[in-house]
């Protein structure tokens, strides 16, 4: 007997979302009552644009550090294969508005003050593809995303 599996991200109608946005995909409770929250951090409009791998890779490394400086409980923030944003997994319950504020603050730091020396994990020892980074691209994309504003609603623009 095979188990039916539904992958939420493949059920989402990507033609009706309005990026950039933060969307709560769902919350799950563990056997001891612990809660994790899963977020869709969509930075560019699906099927219209994508962030080049080097820029996305650098944003990924920076977010790994910058998010943790701003909020407790981040488990992981990993890029989508389509290169339009990230999945972010958090301990506990959080609102899209709260996470959108954190992402906005991180992107502001990337766009305005980040230098190459600030990017963590860019050596052969600390990164599995250390040559594929671009701070220039990361900064330019951060500026473009911030110019559009980050919404806390995937379907109606509500810029925070």
Swiss-Prot record:
Cofactors named for this entry: Fe cation
Catalytic reactions on record: S-(5-deoxy-D-ribos-5-yl)-L-homocysteine = (S)-4,5-dihydroxypentane-2,3-dione + L-homocysteine
Keyword Iron applies: yes
Listed EC numbers: 4.4.1.21
Cofactor note: Binds 1 Fe cation per subunit.
Keyword match Membrane: no
GO MF assignments: iron ion binding; S-ribosylhomocysteine lyase activity
Residues annotated for Fe cation binding in this entry: 57, 61, 127
InterPro entries: LuxS_sf (IPR037005), Metalloenz_LuxS/M16 (IPR011249), S-ribosylhomocysteinase (IPR003815)
Subunit annotation: Homodimer.
Family: Belongs to the LuxS family.
Biological role: Involved in the synthesis of autoinducer 2 (AI-2) which is secreted by bacteria and is used to communicate both the cell density and the metabolic potential of the environment. The regulation of gene expression in response to changes in cell density is called quorum sensing. Catalyzes the transformation of S-ribosylhomocysteine (RHC) to homocysteine (HC) and 4,5-dihydroxy-2,3-pentadione (DPD).
PANTHER family the record matches: S-RIBOSYLHOMOCYSTEINE LYASE
Name of the protein described by the UniProt record: S-ribosylhomocysteine lyase
Organism: Streptococcus gordonii (strain Challis / ATCC 35105 / BCRC 15272 / CH1 / DL1 / V288)
Underlying gene: luxS
